[in-house]
Amino acid sequence: MISTSLLLVVLLFAILAIVDAQWGYGGPYGGYGGGYGGGPWGYGGGWRRRHWGGYGGGPWGGYGGGPWGGYYGK
């Protein structure tokens, strides 16, 4: 049987992973690499890292440009 402490650690990491996927590193307008180098929000723009963040260009930042940025653009 899995120990309670191990289960709690796994649960904590799962929660952190979900939060990171939603908001990235740095809160509502943060995000790992979000909006790096362009757009109204500048460095760290966008609240949902995979959809709104990314690095450089586009109206809201984002590697691929597009209205809301994001690494692959939109």
From Swiss-Prot:
Any single GO BP term: defense response to fungus
Disulfide bonds: none
Source taxon at top rank: Eukaryota
Signal peptide: 1-21
GO cellular component: extracellular region
Keyword S-adenosyl-L-methionine: no
Positions where Tyrosine amide occurs in the chain: Y72
Function: May have antifungic activity against D.coniospora.
Name this polypeptide is given: Neuropeptide-like protein 33
